[in-house]
């Protein structure tokens, strides 16, 4: 339990940031799931459209330290590779 005023304020700030980060992480995961679902269906057009939404969200999450930059890049790379396989 926080004793000082500044520690109490820090606790409130952390709670707010956690809520925001959880929301952003949930949105990011949802957009990635849409891409993965389109890939599983074999619908390349839908996968490309979903990827246009997912990539900026992944990179924004990395920029805001919700996920690591390399993790975001790896996810984007793997999804793009899977979409490219659909074209063959």
Curated annotation (Swiss-Prot):
Q: Which GO terms describe its cellular component?
A: cytosol; small ribosomal subunit
Q: What would you give as a GO molecular function for this chain, any one?
A: structural constituent of ribosome
Q: Which domain of life is it from?
A: Bacteria
Q: Which UniProt keywords apply?
A: Ribonucleoprotein, Ribosomal protein, RNA-binding, rRNA-binding
GO terms for biological process, alphabetical: translation
Which InterPro entries does UniProt cross-reference here? Answer: Ribosomal_bS20, Ribosomal_bS20_sf
Return the similarity comment: Belongs to the bacterial ribosomal protein bS20 family.
Its job: Binds directly to 16S ribosomal RNA.
What's the name of the protein?
Small ribosomal subunit protein bS20
């Amino acid at each position: 339990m926080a004793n000082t005023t500044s520690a109490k304020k820090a606790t409130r700030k952390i709670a707010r940031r956690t809520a925001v980060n959880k929301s952003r992480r949930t949105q990011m995961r949802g957009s990635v799931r849409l891409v993965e679902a389109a890939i599983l269906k074999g619908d390349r057009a839908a996968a490309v459209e979903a990827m246009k939404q997912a990539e900026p969200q992944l990179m924004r999450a990395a920029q805001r330290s919700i996920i690591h930059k390399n993790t975001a890049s790896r996810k984007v790379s793997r999804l793009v590779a899977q979409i490219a396989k659909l074209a063959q």
